[in-house]
């Protein structure tokens, strides 16, 4: 039975690092990664715009369905912290009759921002401080004081 692995965590919490390590240990062609950042990169050079998010969400769901329908496991690499998003993935897994696993990632805000600055210095995607603060205020307020 195919499975959906939902990665959950703020930006810079280690989701993609975990994903990459996991993929190294999977047989080639057995698992597909669906990543909203990658879809944004394909559509708009990685630039986030609210206007484009409807298309990003549509492609994300389409790719998940295609993967499971092809007998593959699917990793959903995004923050996946919003309760509506979690409910959507549970509903989709039920509809597709597949297992769903949630892998949770947490680091304090200070650690995430340190990783964010390092990512920027290495030429990677930088998440604005305001966006990072919003994630922590909304989902992990206790992590702001650490």
What are these regions (language model features)?
Residues 2-6, 32, 71-75:
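Residue-level preference for the first positions of well-ordered beta-strands
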Residues 9, 36, 78:
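Residues immediately flanking
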Residues 16-72, 118:
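Conserved substrate/cofactor phosphate-moiety recognition/catalytic segment
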Residues 42, 46, 81-123:
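ATP-dependent NMP and nucleoside kinases share a basic, alpha-helical "lid"
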Residues 51-100:
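Glycine-rich phosphate-binding loop used to anchor ATP phosphates in small-molecule kinases
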